[in-house]
């Protein structure tokens, strides 16, 4: 789904047979979700929250972009029809089970944490991570961040603004290899909780997403090197995630009516030292979600709109900010490093 336009252009340039089949109207070009939904129900369609990531969708018109289709040489006839997030695809594999919702995982994660509440904001930390903000019923563009359809049905459409982080848990898999740490010995949250560092680590192995958008480069070590204490490097790696969250939140400030009082965090990477660091860095309390998989819960909420969840039980631990001059100096050091090495 991600950046499908350039992928389409590359494939038809490299494969003349594929190009001819597309030209003859024999094939649809679309994301995996569209392939699966058609395979299971026989209904062709790509829903809007995923279509947004193709570089072929015009978020203002709610349709495929004529400019982008022309740019990448994509014929509208080879694209599946656009459908809302909540849509009657039919029954799956001749069963009595209907397919009624197809949605992007980060959209579902925010719905799982905050429903469709306007102005809601949440974080999700898995292999990668993201900060998601419900911008309401008007598409909103923020420099450095991604704007998408958040939710849609036949009557209404909501939009979200999101900052993605390429490496969260995958960062620690990378450091296992770089530092020669066995996977079962990493325990990054334990290592980070007992260690402090003045160093800065910029993870370049998988590139940087929001708000810098840089392709892969060599990791940057500042006041660190691979001969440093490995726990210190792990701590600096964890802090890089927090710094990116802070940078994304600063990008969001102009479109938020007020500073959030609580930032909820879900996903397997939502561990105590990271959440405390984010709270200290941003000055916003961070709540650890009681439910590990908020993505699946988001789907449940869409399918059961009358279900009333108990918001008082949505977090089991709140990390309150502990302001300090040291954290301010560390943030400035990060920003200076990004200015020097990235921008």
Could you tell me what each predicted segment is?
Residues 71-78:
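A structural motif corresponding to the C-terminal end of an alpha-helix
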Residues 2-45, 50, 55-66, 70-71, ...:
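Active-site core segments that coordinate phosphate-bearing ligands/cofactors
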Residues 82-88:
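Gly/charged, well-structured mid-domain segments that form the phosphate/adenylate-handling core
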């Amino acid at each position: 789904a991600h950046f499908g336009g350039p992928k389409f252009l590359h494939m038809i340039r490299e494969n003349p047979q594929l190009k001819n089949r597309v030209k003859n109207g024999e094939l649809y070009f679309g994301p995996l979700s569209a392939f699966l939904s058609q395979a299971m129900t026989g209904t062709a369609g790509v829903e809007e929250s995923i279509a947004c990531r193709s570089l072929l969708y015009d978020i203002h018109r709610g349709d495929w972009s004529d400019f982008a289709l022309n740019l990448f040489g994509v014929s509208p006839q080879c694209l599946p029809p656009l459908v809302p997030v909540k849509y009657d695809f039919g029954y799956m594999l001749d069963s009595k089970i209907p397919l009624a919702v197809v949605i992007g995982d980060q959209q579902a994660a925010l719905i799982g944490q905050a429903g469709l509440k306007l102005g809601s904001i949440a974080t999700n930390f898995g292999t990668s991570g993201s900060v998601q903000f419900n911008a309401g019923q008007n598409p909103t563009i923020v420099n450095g961040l991604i704007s998408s359809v958040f939710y849609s049905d036949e009557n209404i459409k909501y939009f979200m603004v999101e900052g993605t982080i390429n490496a969260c848990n995958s960062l620690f898999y990378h450091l296992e290899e770089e530092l020669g740490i066995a996977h079962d010995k990493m325990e990054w949250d334990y290592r980070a909780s007992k260690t402090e560092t003045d160093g800065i680590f910029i993870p370049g192995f998988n590139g940087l997403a929001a708000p810098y958008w840089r392709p892969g480069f060599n990791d940057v070590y500042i006041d660190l090197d691979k001969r440093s204490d490995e726990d210190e490097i792990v701590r600096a790696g964890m802090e890089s995630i927090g710094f990116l969250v802070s940078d994304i939140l600063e990008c969001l400030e102009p479109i938020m009516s007020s500073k959030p009082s609580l930032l909820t965090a879900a996903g397997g990477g939502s561990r105590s030292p990271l959440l405390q660091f984010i709270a200290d860095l941003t000055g916003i309390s961070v709540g650890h979600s009681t439910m590990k998989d908020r993505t699946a819960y988001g789907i449940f909420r869409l399918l059961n709109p009358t279900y009333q969840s108990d918001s008082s039980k949505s977090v089991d631990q709140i990390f309150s900010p502990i302001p300090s001059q040291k954290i301010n100096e560390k943030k400035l050091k990060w920003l200076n490093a990004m200015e020097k090495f990235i921008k």
